[in-house]
Amino acid sequence: MTSGKQAAINAALADVGNSYATGWNQPGECLVSVRRWLAAGGINFGYGDPNSGYVASGATQVSWSNVQPGDVVQYESAYSPDSWIGGVHTVLVTGVSGGSVQIVEANNPGGSGYVSSNSNWSPAPPAGFRAVVWRFPG
């Protein structure tokens, strides 16, 4: 793992237990939180929609079977991947061990702005959504 991804993971883990304001582009939103954690590692996650923002940042899609610490999992609409609609969610993978995936996420439950971790996580997107794993350079 690169030092940048380790720094991003460390920033996310240090944020667990904090709560932030929510609303469009507020620090408690899941995507804004993941962007903040990646930036702590010097990883650029530019602005855009749920799909195009990753592509514009140089991230590439990888399969769930290849997920690694530092990857980002994005729930996106299966019908309109670049739409900001209810059900979109973003998490940072902080560890993978023996088939178990650890993540840090913000704003779950929605509207809470709460940052939490989960040590045995697997994607469970809502109906009509899919989970996409993105790997950033750096």
What function would you assign to each model-found segment?
Residues 2-80:
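Secreted/periplasmic proteins that engage bacterial cell-wall peptidoglycan
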Residues 3, 20, 87-138:
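Aromatic- and glycine-rich peptidoglycan recognition patches
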Residues 59, 86-87:
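Long, domain-scale functional regions
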